[in-house]
Curated annotation (Swiss-Prot):
Subcellular location: Plastid, Chloroplast thylakoid membrane
Pfam families according to UniProt: ATP-synt_A
Keywords: ATP synthesis, CF(0), Chloroplast, Hydrogen ion transport, Ion transport, Membrane, Plastid, Thylakoid, Transmembrane, Transmembrane helix, Transport
Name of protein: ATP synthase subunit a, chloroplastic
GO cellular component, one term: plasma membrane
Organism: Manihot esculenta (Cassava)
Amino acid sequence: MNVLSCSINTLTLRGLYDISGVEVGQHFYWKIGGFQVHAQVLITSWVVIAILLGSAIVAVRNPQTIPTGGQNFFEYVLEFIRDVSKTQIGEEYGPWVPFIGTMFLFIFVSNWAGALLPWKIIQLPHGELAAPTNDINTTVALALLTSIAYFYAGLSKKGLGYFSKYIQPTPILLPINILEDFTKPLSLSFRLFGNILADELVVVVLVSLVPSVVPIPVMFLGLFTSGIQALIFATLAAAYIGESMEGHH
């Protein structure tokens, strides 16, 4: 019994030491000109883009009138993105389908790649590879692109009259309406970053403590929530664009 108790205590302490070694925010930098960029984010982003482009090329290289296989899957995804865009934007959704689709697919594949691909096999001088959406710089960039998109949508439809929304329904709300333009990208970026980072940290901690079958259900739950986060981001992006074009809250 004493030997068994000592073994359990040793395993528990080893798990706790492993948890204490989990590092967050370690980056491998490239120097480009006078700037430092997060190399691991660029590497994993290129991998995600390659997966998307490669899958699309393979799926539609021989398009058929009656779609099958990969073509059928991509057409289903396109219909899904069109439905989301039309629901949130309205009848003028057409030009925005590529933007909403790009956001959804990039985030979805990034999240799943972080959960499924064995990034830790690739050793870096500092830090480690992870999902692109596990880095706050990526999520902030996606949120800023969304902000630029809905500003462009509003200005292209209403011209300078777009700015009248800041004093509607009363000029008293001007500060709040201006603040809203800052809170939208903040909420988009931190929601996505926080959920993906938390999911990966939970899996790492569980694997350190119980490296058997216990973390597997959590990993499947992470895959589900990763897809939901991609859908939430794309839906909110489309809703913001539709709101800027229609001028209602």
